[in-house]
């Protein structure tokens, strides 16, 4: 199979994706993560802590895919497992009163569902389109009850705060608006995402991703997508700082924490309060 054919397949896949991410409404009760870096760090790469690249297929489950990636990155490596994405997606839609539709979710609701129902192994509730509208089994909820998160918080759409979270060992989920340039052959081949021109490009919709690093030499964040490992740069892409910190293009940055998860760095002070369930 030729490289060109593979790239054409990936380009076709990206144009058929459901861009269903919904922006979370403002809630004054949200806690905000505050980071205070103590040294200058020019690049961070947490990809070695990531799971294999997910492929969401034709389901509008980008929030669950991004959040499952974030959760995995924070797990203790002696006891790591892939969280069930459809368990997360189903419970998110329950909280959103939209369980019988594949219309996406907000990132706040997605993370809140983990605080309420926890996560379970994907082996218990596999990522199978046949499971999309089915309630997970009781075994899933039994395990999930032992794997709830104790805290989650929003992260300011500000460069210093976003880089500070990564320096502290915290990957974060992020919502972005996707324009037609994002699904170009160039991006599918290189993973280098341009800053869109909203006046000239078609808005395709919202998409949730997991930010796993940054590089000042590129002025960009390293981001894990959920379109398979053949898309972009081994399933990842570089999102310019100017894109990720523009409130007209990016929104809903969230982090999570739990006693059974690990994220720490001696070079950054992180304040993340317990969030009410």
Predicted feature descriptions by range:
Residues 30-116:
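Substrate-binding/charge-relay-adjacent region of secreted/lumenal peptidase catalytic domains
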Residues 2-18, 22, 64, 68-72, ...:
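Predominantly the structural core of cysteine protease catalytic domains
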Residues 25, 81, 89, 143-144:
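General helical secondary-structure elements
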Residues 1-49:
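Non-catalytic, low-structured ubiquitin/UBL-interacting segments
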